[in-house]
């Protein structure tokens, strides 16, 4: 593995406390099988630190850096050799919420600027959706679905993916018939599904057989509340049980 041309940022950053910022960044160049002159090392380190906005901190001790600065130093060290592949192992998990959001934007910018292929491992669904072009969902060591963030979120392949990525309401049912209404362009098939709540009109990208047992996924943001009986399909009576104020939105629990 040490001969492969890739950079890696560990979850714990692995910043060496006895080295300053310059020395930490230069270490991969100094131990590389390719020999670099002192001036080459200096230029490469300065370029890497400038990329992650750490210019001017070359002589600062690693232990004097903030959490966000340590994260950027680990990233500079991974980028200094100009790798063909960048591996990130939950690099933001040790940061507080506000800093984590800022670093998500920074990582996205750097990836686009450097055009380096990046594999990012995370348990944070928001990070995965925000940072990725392609997402691979792994369950018990097996990849269960690969797709764009939108595909993963809107078209989960099974119960695990639907329940794992974002909040959802899962309803079991049996397909009774095809819908008579016209359907939207991005959904190829429409079926009437019999459930414990009655008949539900469900859209899917997959062709299904009449009588098939299926699982309907309804995202909270696709549910609308009304005090009057609406027209059309897919509405049910419910009792409001609880409302949680979460700042930018309300979490409403219905029975």
Question: Where in the sequence are the language-model features?
Answer:
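Glycine/charge-rich catalytic "coupling/switch" loops of P-loop NTPases
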Residues: 154, 179-185, 190-244
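ABC ATPase nucleotide-binding domains
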Residues: 5-7, 11-163
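C-terminal boundary and immediately downstream tail of ABC-type ATPase nucleotide-binding domains
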Residues: 155-176, 217
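Short aromatic-glycine-enriched beta-strand elements
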Residues: 189-191, 249-252
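Structural detector for hydrophobic anchor residues on beta-strands
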Residues: 134, 170-171, 200, 236
């Amino acid at each position: 593995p040490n001969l492969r041309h890739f950079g890696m940022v560990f979850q714990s950053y692995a910043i060496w406390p006895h080295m300053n910022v310059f020395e930490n960044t230069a270490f991969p160049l100094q131990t590389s099988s390719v020999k670099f002159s002192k001036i080459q090392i200096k230029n490469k380190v300065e370029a890497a630190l400038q990329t992650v906005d750490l210019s001017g901190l070359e002589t600062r001790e690693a232990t004097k850096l903030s959490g966000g600065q340590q994260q950027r130093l680990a990233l500079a060290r991974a980028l200094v050799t100009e790798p063909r592949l960048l591996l990130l192992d939950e690099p933001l998990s040790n940061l507080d919420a506000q800093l984590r959001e800022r670093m998500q934007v920074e990582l996205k910018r750097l990836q686009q600027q450097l055009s380096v292929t990046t594999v990012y491992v995370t348990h944070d669904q928001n990070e995965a959706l925000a940072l990725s072009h392609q997402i691979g969902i792994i369950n018990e060591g097996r990849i269960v679905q690969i797709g764009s963030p939108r595909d993963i979120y809107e078209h989960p392949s099974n119960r695990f993916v639907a329940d794992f990525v974002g909040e959802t309401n899962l309803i079991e049912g049996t397909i009774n018939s095809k819908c008579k209404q016209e359907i939207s362009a991005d959904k190829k098939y429409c079926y009437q599904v019999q459930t414990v709540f009655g008949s539900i009109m469900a859209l899917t990208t997959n062709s299904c057989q009449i009588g098939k047992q299926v699982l309907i996924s309804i995202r909270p943001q696709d549910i609308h509340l009304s005090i009057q009986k609406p027209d059309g399909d897919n509405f049910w009576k419910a009792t409001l049980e609880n409302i949680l104020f979460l700042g930018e939105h309300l979490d409403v629990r219905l029975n």
